Amino acid sequence: DEGGTQYTPRL
């Protein structure tokens, strides 16, 4: 992903 901030936020 794009750092996990655009499509699926990595929390």
Curated annotation (Swiss-Prot):
Positions where Leucine amide occurs in the chain: 11
Subcellular location: Secreted
Domain of life (superkingdom): Eukaryota
One GO biological process term: neuropeptide signaling pathway
Transmembrane segments: none
Keyword terms: Amidation, Neuropeptide, Secreted
Protein biosynthesis keyword on record: no
Gene Ontology annotations for the cellular component aspect, listed alphabetically: extracellular region
Record-stated family: Belongs to the pyrokinin family.
Biological role: Mediates visceral muscle contractile activity (myotropic activity).
Protein name in UniProt: Pyrokinin-1
Annotated source species: Carausius morosus
Lineage: Eukaryota, Metazoa, Ecdysozoa, Arthropoda, Hexapoda
